[in-house]
Amino acid sequence: MANIGDEKVSQLIPTLGDDKIDMIAATSVLQIRASEIRQTQINWQSYLQGQMITQRDHDFIVNLDQRGQKDLPDKNPDACADVFLNLLTHISKDHTIQYILVLIDDILSEDKSRVKIFRETKYSGNIWQPFLNLLNRQDEFVQHMTARIIAKLACWHPQLMDKSDLHFYLSWLKDQLKMNNNDYIQSVARCLQMMLRVDEYRFAFLSVDGISTLLSILASRVNFQVQYQLVFCLWVLTFNPLLAEKMNKFNAIPILADILSDSVKEKVTRIVLAVFRNLIEKPQDQQVAKEHCIAMVQCKVLKQLSILEQKRSDDEDIMNDVEFLNERLQASVQDLSSFDQYATEVKSGRLEWSPVHKSAKFWRENAARLNERGQELLRTLVHLLEKSHDPVVLAVACYDVGEYVRHYPRGKHIIEQLGGKQRVMYLLSHDDPNVRYEALLAVQKLMVHNWEYLGKQLEKEQIDKQAGTVVGAKA
């Protein structure tokens, strides 16, 4: 996607969010159900007779709903907000609540400026509360149509949503994303696409562990539409420089690189490239931007860019981003030291037997550098020993721990403090023979104190072994 300044993002995203995405939403579960509910009729008179609503509320809703007075909300905004909030508070029947919510959503969709009817009302209570209460209802349509309305009220008015209400709402959306087989997941993602265009809401989403949730779902298999929507959310988040700098701490680049590699839909490719571009352009700390470039190289993004270059898409945004990324990643490769390469590989969590691991020169020159930034790389290695299920990753991590101990005088003590020795010993009984072998070597290195003495002993054993072979041959 072509480079878009932060000042323009608020103009771009509403268009993408409201027009193009609503065309997709028309076939979503929420919209199909909403179109069915519009065809029903509510007997408002029965609610009046049962004294569940007032005469004023009855007359207003009948004039709006049954007598076609569509301009009523604009003519009498205070009454409109008051009536709808009263109805949501005093009526309990799911079917009627569904209908009221569809009416409210239609009113807002017809004219965005109508959000001020609810946001600037003289309603005595907290206007968010009637809506937030509905998120706890059992009826799924009620929950998700309410969530859609809340997003519009929160995004289409300059006054921000209150922090406590915002925290509750974003936590609810996050939990809905994590729910297995959620038929309304497109609607949930749609709400986030709207909310995350507001900078203050982006940080609130970070505080409820939202970014890691997005990425954990993207790391699993989801359909391409949800994939697009969730990557879109990441794209919006990366317009904030601080969030762009944090993004790869959540392992975003490897996950997005996998999506790019597997993508068969052009719009998914386009949005992933746009995120990658922001991860390079938006961070104010150029060291972070450099690390992002190296991480992309490590995750084989250059190969995918080459494939896209050969395909020559008609999409100008894609080709612009391919050209930009190619240029920046190629430049980062030229400046890449062996330690940069190693550090990026460790941070990616995708260890493989690349040349640096087996290079004695590398370990002599760089073992001490594993202590930099609060022993960040060592901590990552120990974390991989504990959490990874990939035998190659485990074997390489064991080897690296052993080489660090071998080449850094206080290495044994530091690894023990970080819990690395215990993890390596645990892997002595791993199912994979290569993991067991590398774990055994690492344990031996952890146990030995005098490397010079060990080297001489190994050399002596080798000489004795060769001498024995010669004597045996003569005999």
Curated annotation (Swiss-Prot):
Record-linked SUPFAM superfamilies: ARM repeat
Endpoints of the signal sequence: none
InterPro entries per record: ARM-like, ARM-type_fold, ATPase_V1-cplx_hsu, ATPase_V1-cplx_hsu_C, ATPase_V1-cplx_hsu_C_sf
Keyword tags: Hydrogen ion transport, Ion transport, Transport
GO molecular function list: proton-transporting ATPase activity, rotational mechanism
CDD domains: VATPase_H
GO cellular component, one term: vacuolar proton-transporting V-type ATPase, V1 domain
Keyword Transmembrane included in the entry's annotation: no
Keyword ATP-binding found: no
Homology family: Belongs to the V-ATPase H subunit family.
Assembly and binders: V-ATPase is a heteromultimeric enzyme made up of two complexes: the ATP-hydrolytic V1 complex and the proton translocation V0 complex. The V1 complex consists of three catalytic AB heterodimers that form a heterohexamer, three peripheral stalks each consisting of EG heterodimers, one central rotor including subunits D and F, and the regulatory subunits C and H. The proton translocation complex V0 consists of the proton transport subunit a, a ring of proteolipid subunits c9c'', rotary subunit d, subunits e and f, and the accessory subunits VhaAC45 and ATP6AP2.
Function recorded in the entry: Subunit of the V1 complex of vacuolar(H+)-ATPase (V-ATPase), a multisubunit enzyme composed of a peripheral complex (V1) that hydrolyzes ATP and a membrane integral complex (V0) that translocates protons. V-ATPase is responsible for acidifying and maintaining the pH of intracellular compartments and in some cell types, is targeted to the plasma membrane, where it is responsible for acidifying the extracellular environment. Subunit H is essential for V-ATPase activity, but not for the assembly of the complex.
Protein name: V-type proton ATPase subunit H
